[in-house]
């Protein structure tokens, strides 16, 4: 009990920080100095922020408007965009910053004074977005834009001694800034540590020391060893040292990372410090050459080509220089196709190679520190500075799990969100209330969101695929996928995570209350009567499983989900959706998938003393199994309507059906094994064992649901010992490969070594990797596995090269504007509990509509005086991979997320870690 008050006070402090962030998002602030820190002993770092946007809001009018959805009209001294199915709502415009940092002035090293002396020899700067909004542009269309934060590095003529200093700014940009430098108090920018904390028992506790200075010597890399910084300490709230250790070099800037998922162990970056030269011609027939008058490139060098196809070509082509002449350069090893012609503005410059960090990375391992009491602590690099405060609490991972569960709650569809997890929103997608859901004859498997990808999902509501019927009143619920609002069968992976936690966790943890609704609160009160005492995790699993149970047809088949016929319209909230909404036709794969999870739920309900409810789900699972079995035995008949739609809509001809059929059959056969293993574990029936063993004894793997099949079989009452041993060895070998990859990874990651980087790979672990870690740990008890889980989650929560938490609502420095369309439309703070995808290859987010001409939000071409101060600097292709996080919602591959790829797995892993903490 003695530890309760400090924990409460920290949580209160974090809540206040969160409130201030939320308040700041609603009212513009002036151009301001956000923080003065120390980067290296002889480099001061100052963060400057442009004013943030003043948020607009959604207002309801007395009647409908004649203008179409998306039109801007004058209203009350501002502009509003018409939204909503009845056109009786306006989304009032956000107000962009009125003042931007003058970058040309801030970069003038000779104009600074420190204590009146010209001791600043160089200025380096990194400018990235931190806030965003939208409004009506001068042309009358909707315009998105960003506000920038600037990390300004001031190189000194000598190391900074402890003391009080006054900094005078060039051009009187700011009043004189007085700051005190104390290595035991001043934050060191390069300490990359958790923004959240640890439990005392955590097997692994690590932080990192890394700084990249854009345009600085040695390609911006910083070797802290050259400063003699060799020791670190842990300080308690009084400033006393409670632990000390060595600062150890972990990675060099050019250390190869063979498992980075980028196709090469090192990455090409645009070199800073020299001007790009114009490319005025290209020849691609035969040996590819470019015409570059005045170049000085040498054979064998790497170069980067940009804007080859014009202002909206925001990608880069890296290549090797072959033969050279005075005006031409032969292009070898081009990483992507070259265009037949080039446009004005195309450039070439040298490139360098480095790893994802692009700098020296030092590790501070304090795993041996076992604090005896909860409290607030900091890391100090002796002689440099300190980290942000982090909390030690026995409830730490429980709290992180609760926050992530709150993130899932904040994505529930079909109910009003009541603010219990920091976000309020009216009910959305309720048939008969604010939406009509049409039945489509397009199966999910045939759509662009399914296996075949033959039909754009948007077409599912057009005349080719409409059968004229509306879905029933029960077609509500489930999770919204992420930034958009679709509810897909894949979301059942989240339910599977929570059902498995019921098997993994000690009994006392199953009694934990996370504050989520009981099933009887929103679902059928008769069906779920007397279930309130079930574990919260079971209620959370039921939420999505029940949704798909209600999508089950009379014949037992399952629909793949519900979706809008297009991505969300900017400024339109989910509860004011104007696009057509449809439900996919049943498909065999979705039906097997549901049979597996419903059977698993029935087993758990039986174990928790709910036999009647268990029967409901077991009967539903059996009907799904039988329907899928009938379908797979005659795919021609099952998909006859869908094939007719393909032909009628011109997506395929009848001759393409055999190949399509084969792909559908392969997917269904795999998911048949998943369902059979689950149902065998639940029922013990021989027919399910036979169906499972037939494939499991072959060349099986653990990709996503296939891992479920292996795990369910291993945990069944009677098994073939050879198959079981083979599957157990598969879990162990896959995990061993994952652990081996950490030896060369700059920062820990649960990305599968063979998975390509991006879309979360290398950031939050997906459900498959989360299950792999938990299941292998259950088999082996190997603490190295939980150590990797701890390192990965701490990396997401701040121990990364940005020093930011990638989880909304957690951390002093956190992501504020993920691609969550409701908060953007409503003009409010993003809901807590979202974990974004994070890092991705620069070419993967080279969107021309973002990094293009002057009309784009982060323009790089044809710059006006305004857009000159709103572009990312330095070049996106010069910033190291782990620094290159663009906090702008429409950078989809970084700023989006899904309930099953990021939020659900992080929730499950945090709760699993909580289960490893000794009970009070």
Listing of model-derived features with the role each one plays in the protein:
Residues 533-558:
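Carboxylate/His-rich catalytic cores and anion/metal-binding grooves
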Residues 523-533, 537:
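Acidic, glycine-anchored loop motifs typical of Ca2+
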Residues 11-22:
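Bacterial N-terminal signal peptides
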Residues 181-204, 386-425:
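Low-complexity, Pro/Ser/Thr- and charge-rich linker/hinge segments at domain boundaries
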Residues 26-28:
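Boundary at the C-terminal end of the N-terminal hydrophobic targeting segment
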Residues 35-38, 42-152, 196-197, 205-210, ...:
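Aromatic (Trp/Tyr) and acidic
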Residues 174-179, 264, 380-394:
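Short Trp-Ser/Thr-centered turn/loop motifs at beta-strand boundaries
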Residues 269-355:
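Small/polar beta-strand repeat architecture
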């Amino acid at each position: 009990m003695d530890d309760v008050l400090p924990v409460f006070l920290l949580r209160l402090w974090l809540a206040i920080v969160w409130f201030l962030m939320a308040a700041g998002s609603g009212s513009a602030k002036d151009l301001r100095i956000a923080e003065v820190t120390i980067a290296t002993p002889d480099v001061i770092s100052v963060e400057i922020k442009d004013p943030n946007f003043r948020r607009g809001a959604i207002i309801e009018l007395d009647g409908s408007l004649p203008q179409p959805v998306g039109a801007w009209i004058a209203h009350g001294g501002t502009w509003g965009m018409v939204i909503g199915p009845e056109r009786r709502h306006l989304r009032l415009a956000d107000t962009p910053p009125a003042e931007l940092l003058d970058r040309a002035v801030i970069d003038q090293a000779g104009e600074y004074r420190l204590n009146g002396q010209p001791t600043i020899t160089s200025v380096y700067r990194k400018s990235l977005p931190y806030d965003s909004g939208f409004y009506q542009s001068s042309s009358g269309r909707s315009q998105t834009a960003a506000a920038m934060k600037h990390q300004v590095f001031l190189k000194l003529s000598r190391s900074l001694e402890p003391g009080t200093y006054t900094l005078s700014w060039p051009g009187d940009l700011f009043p004189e800034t007085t700051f005190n430098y104390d290595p035991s108090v001043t934050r060191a920018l390069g300490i990359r540590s958790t923004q959240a904390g640890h439990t005392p028992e955590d097997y692994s506790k690590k932080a990192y020391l890394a700084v990249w200075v854009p345009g600085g010597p040695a390609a911006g890399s910083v070797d802290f060893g050259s400063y003699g910084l060799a020791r670190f300490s842990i300080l308690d709230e009084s400033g006393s040292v409670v632990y000390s250790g060595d600062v150890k070099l972990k990675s060099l800037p050019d250390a190869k990372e063979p498992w980075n998922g980028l196709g090469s162990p090192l990455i090409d970056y645009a070199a800073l410090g020299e001007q790009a030269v114009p490319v005025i011609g290209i020849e691609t027939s035969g040996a590819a050459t470019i015409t570059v008058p005045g170049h000085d490139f040498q054979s064998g060098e790497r170069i980067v080509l940009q804007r080859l196809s014009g202002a909206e070509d925001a990608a880069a082509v890296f290549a090797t220089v072959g033969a050279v002449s005075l005006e031409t350069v032969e292009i070898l090893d081009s990483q992507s196709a070259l265009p037949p012609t080039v446009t004005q503005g195309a450039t070439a410059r040298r490139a360098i190679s480095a790893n994802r960090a692009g700098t020296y990375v030092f590790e501070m391992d304090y795993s041996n520190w076992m604090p005896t009491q909860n409290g607030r602590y900091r890391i100090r690099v002796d002689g440099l500075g300190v980290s942000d405060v982090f909390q030690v609490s026995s409830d730490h991972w429980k709290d992180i799990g609760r926050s992530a569960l709150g993130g899932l709650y904040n994505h529930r569809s079909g109910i009003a969100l009541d603010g219990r997890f920091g976000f309020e929103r009216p009910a959305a997608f309720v048939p008969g209330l604010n939406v009509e859901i049409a039945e489509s004859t397009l199966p999910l498997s045939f759509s662009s969101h399914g296996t075949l990808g033959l039909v754009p999902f948007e077409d599912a509501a057009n005349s080719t695929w409409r059968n004229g019927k509306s879905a029933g009143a029960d077609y509500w619920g489930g999770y919204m996928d992420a930034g958009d609002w679709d509810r897909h069968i894949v979301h059942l992976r989240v339910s599977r995570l929570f059902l498995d936690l019921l098997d993994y966790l000690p009994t006392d943890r199953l009694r934990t209350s996370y504050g989520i609704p009981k099933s009887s609160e929103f679902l059928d009160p008769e069906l779920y009567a007397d279930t309130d005492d079930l574990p919260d995790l079971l209620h959370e699993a039921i939420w999505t499983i029940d949704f798909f149970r209600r999508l089950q047809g009379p014949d037992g088949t399952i629909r793949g989900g519900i979706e809008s016929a297009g991505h969300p319209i900017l400024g339109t909230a989910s509860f004011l959706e104007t696009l057509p909404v449809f439900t996919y036709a049943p498909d065999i794969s979705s039906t097997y998938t549901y049979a597996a999870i419903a059977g698993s739920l029935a087993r758990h309900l039986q174990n928790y003393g709910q036999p009647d409810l268990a029967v409901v789900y077991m009967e539903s699972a059996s009907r799904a199994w039988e329907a899928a079995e009938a379908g797979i035995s005659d795919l021609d008949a099952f998909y006859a309507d869908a094939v007719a739609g393909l032909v009628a809509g011109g997506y395929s001809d009848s001759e393409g059906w055999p190949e399509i059929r084969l792909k559908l059959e392969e997917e269904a056969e795999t998911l048949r094994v998943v369902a059979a293993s689950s149902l065998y574990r639940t029922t013990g029936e021989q027919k399910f064992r036979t169906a499972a063993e037939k494939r499991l004894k072959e060349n099986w793997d653990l990709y996503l649901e296939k891992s479920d099949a292996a795990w369910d079989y291993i945990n069944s009452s009677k098994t073939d010992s050879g198959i079981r041993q083979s599957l157990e060895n598969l879990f162990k070998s896959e995990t061993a490969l994952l652990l081996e990859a950490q030896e060369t990874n700059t920062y820990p990651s649960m990305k599968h070594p063979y998975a390509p980087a991006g879309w979360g790979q290398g950031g939050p672990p997906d459900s498959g990797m989360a299950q792999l870690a938990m299941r292998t740990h259950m088999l082996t008890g190997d603490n190295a596995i939980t150590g990797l889980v701890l390192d990965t989650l701490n990396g997401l929560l701040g121990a990364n090269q940005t020093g930011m938490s990638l989880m909304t609502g957690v951390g002093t420095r956190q992501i504020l504007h993920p691609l969550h369309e409701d908060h953007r439309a409503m003009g409010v703070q993003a809901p807590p509990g979202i974990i974004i995808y994070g890092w991705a290859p620069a070419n993967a987010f080279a969107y021309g509509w973002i990094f293009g001409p002057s009309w784009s939000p982060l323009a790089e071409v044809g710059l006006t005086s305004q857009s000159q101060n709103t572009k990312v600097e330095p070049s996106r292709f010069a910033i190291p991979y782990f620094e290159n996080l663009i906090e702008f919602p429409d950078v989809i591959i970084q700023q989006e997320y899904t309930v099953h790829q990021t939020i659900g797995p992080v929730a499950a892993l945090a709760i699993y870690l909580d289960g490893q903490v000794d009970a009070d």
